[in-house]
Amino acid sequence: MVGFAEVIRALGGDSDSESPLHGVSSSTSPKPQTVSFLRKWTTDSARLLEENPQTLFIVPPEGADATRENAVAVANPRLAYALVVRDFLQGDLPATLSPMAFISESAELADTVSVGHFAVIEDGVVVGPGSVIDHHVVLRTGVRVGSNTRIGSHTSVGGRGFGFEMDDDGRPIRIGHMGGVLIGDHVEIGSHCAIAQGTIEPTRISDHVKIDDCVFIAHNVFVGENSFIIAGAEISGSATIGRDVWISPEAAVINKASIGDGALVGIGAVVIKDVEDHTIVAGVPAKPIGHRPPR
């Protein structure tokens, strides 16, 4: 059983508390035997700790002198809280393959992969250790998923992209897509997303990318490491998204555009030309409005 003392020591503090830890609570409604965090130290913070001795608080450095057996001061309380929840409260769930999923005999799934109900994993798909394929996910032939990656319910990866060429009679002829999709390690893809496979070369989602629900990523797109793409965004074909980029909700990026490292695209922006590194753009069409400092 996890206790306050174990968590406090893991965060660099010292405690002999015997209180057990069973869950989480907010700082506005603290509950016994839970962990909470304070973003800022205010004049009321010390009283909050004193009145709730059975709640474990993670506080900013300004609260170090007032910490008690139920508190620990760290540089980044929100990050420390996230690590405590991950490492002490959530834990690793056992890998399970739903009997109601379709998994091709030629698919390669590591032993620690989990697959939910009614998921479809087609021929030749590769999924790395620790990854979770949620209910109703479809992974088409040509998809490779790295380790410790999670794909949310009702997401389709590797479907054919939207590309046509007109014949001599002016009729649209679909261009076959055979490039597949490469998804890196520690990627999170939300529910109801669609990621199209590349035409010839793969669509690529790099390590540690975080994609929210209801995002569309077209064929041949490249998304760099540590980038965030938020709900409702649309990335058109052959666009390049750099490292540490933030694409806000409902933003759209035109085909073949390049978004530089560290850039931020504002809510509902329509990007019709390249965006330089660490530039903030917003509006329709998107225009530079500021500078985003490197992290």
Question: What kind of feature is each model-predicted range?
Answer:
Residues F37, T96-A282, A286-I289:
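Structural signal for interior beta-strand "rungs" in well-ordered beta-sheet cores
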Residues M1-M100, N148, H154-T155, G159-R174, ...:
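Terminal amphipathic alpha-helical/low-complexity segments used for targeting or macromolecular assembly
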